[in-house]
Amino acid sequence: MQKIIKDDRSYVWHPYASASDKNPIYPVKKAKGTYIYLETGEKLIDGMSSWWCVINGYNHPRLNKAIKNQISKFSHVMFGGFTHKPAVELAKKINEITPASLQKVFFSDSGSVSVEVAMKFAVQYWHSQSLIKKKKFLTVKNGYHGDTMGTMSISDPVNGMHKMFEKSLLKQFYVSSPESIEDYKRDKSRSLKEMETKLIDKHAEIAAVVIEPILQGAGGMRIYHPDYLLQLKKLCK
């Protein structure tokens, strides 16, 4: 185990970690269900599902079987100009369980890249309509959307983790984050009015509104009132 840690220190740069002032690391032996088992024999509850990527738990027999079956055929092929049955079946299934207005599936490899692609879609749409000035984005403060350059530009500009890149990022439009559910029940006018004002004032420049679905995660697990999302959708239309 000590050799693993030593080699890790020598060759690996972990995400969200300093290359010089290094945080402790914990070698993992195996994982099952909601648990991570360390080389030391300790058992941990993975309460964040490995950054939300293992929502069905580790070592799920159905997923393991599907992975083993697929790897014996091919692990990966480029998706430009090619297709294959698993991708088509998954896209069809996603289409069946999402709103009718969402008709196509674009596969991506991370949350950051997914948001980045969505931003490009929005800009490209307005460009096709000859409205090339609509290339900026409106979002709420306290948000987190990813670690690529585009997604950093729409994450919280003051208290977020990307402050040091501020002068390198595109400048976007921000409004205050919405009230808590209880505060929204008492008075929903503030956040919606601010959003409406910004949309009216800057509509000629705004390509899209970007917002985390359901809640602001990294920003404090702040859950949106469902009506806020509904009213925001109406404002955008």
Give the role of each language-model region.
Residues M1-K32:
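Active-site-adjacent loop/helix segments that line or gate small-molecule/cofactor pockets in enzymes
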Residues R222-K237:
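Catalytic PLP-binding core of fold-type I/II PLP enzymes
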Residues K92-A208:
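PLP-dependent aspartate aminotransferase-fold enzymes
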Residues P27-Y37, W52-N69, G80-K92:
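A structural motif shared across PLP-dependent enzymes of the aminotransferase-like
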Residues I45-M48, V175-S176, V210-L215:
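Short beta-strands and strand-loop turn motifs
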Residues K3-D7, I71-F106:
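Cysteine/selenocysteine-centered motifs that mediate thiol-based redox chemistry or coordinate metal-sulfur cofactors
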Residues S180-I181, E212-H225:
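Conserved PLP phosphate-binding loop immediately N-terminal to the Schiff-base lysine helix
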